A protein has these predicted regions:
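Extended, histidine- and acidic-residue-enriched regions that form the cofactor-binding/catalytic faces
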Residues: 1-83, 87-103, 111-253
Length: 253
């Protein structure tokens, strides 16, 4: 059930009987040379399509933008300042709260949004609400450790292949991941992580200073298959439907 498709009397009718709303958020950012900029939004959107067929929970419009400062130099990336994003989402929550929403299920497609969602969760708990943050890619890891992946790696590439194979430019996947190290003894191991004497520390850099392509992770994009993506997306959507049914039962004080 989509909020955008309801008349206001129908919305009123929903909130008289229900207090849960499902919202998704993503980002528009680089995911390597082979992946669409909208990866983090396309995946939650696709999950919503599956969920809508199996659940009667009200679905609010997707928020397509996110906070992605470290990836901002890549052409096409749209970075929303963390405070601006928080205030924008807060206004959405306040409007829904006014109408009767008390349980918010935030389906998240982008790691850079996590701090903002946590902040909303703390604020709205003080108002008698609960905010569930569902980071789909982390949930998928728990469902099947073989699906574990990084940014623009096999996991996300498989998901996009499962949605629309034409969106993945396989000719741009390339060879092994090449990090840009700070020195012979300061070896880059991730977005921020640098290994020194067997210990990882964080050194904050823009992603083009870490790797050229923009994908990072232990799972090479070439390992992705359409079948993997379809199974992972179906399993994740089914889990979310089951979770929301259980979440409905929670009594708020």
């Amino acid at each position: 059930m989509r909020l955008t498709n309801l008349t206001w009397p129908k919305a009123q009718e929903y909130f008289e009987k229900n207090d849960m709303v499902l919202i998704s958020i993503g980002s528009i950012e680089c995911h390597g040379r082979h992946m669409p900029l909208g990866t983090d939004t396309l995946i939650p959107d696709h999950l919503l399509e599956k969920i809508e067929k199996k659940s009667d929970v009200l679905i609010a419009p997707t928020i397509p933008y996110g906070s992605c400062q470290c990836l901002a130099p890549y052409p096409g990336t749209i970075d929303i300042n963390g405070e601006v994003l928080y205030q924008f989402c807060r206004q959405i929550f306040l409007s829904l709260y006014r109408h009767g929403a008390r349980k918010f299920v935030f389906l998240n497609g982008h790691g850079g949004n996590i701090k903002m969602i946590e902040r909303l969760g703390m604020e709205f708990e003080d108002k008698g609400c609960l905010v569930a943050m569902l980071n789909w890619w982390l949930m998928a890891w728990d469902m099947n450790p073989a699906w574990k992946g990084g940014h623009g790696g096999g996991e996300e590439t498989a998901a996009i292949l499962g949605i629309d194979p034409s969106l993945v430019d396989k000719s741009e996947i390339g060879g092994e991941l090449k990090f840009k190290h700070l020195s012979d003894n300061l070896k880059t191991t991730g977005f921020r992580s640098v290994e020194f004497k067997g210990v990882n520390v964080d050194i904050i850099r823009n992603t083009p200073h870490v790797t050229d392509s923009g994908w990072i992770g232990p799972d090479h994009p070439s390992t992705a298959t359409e079948e993997w993506g379809k199974e992972m997306l179906e399993t994740t959507a089914n889990y979310i439907v089951d979770f929301m049914e259980e979440f409905k039962k929670v009594k708020l004080s």
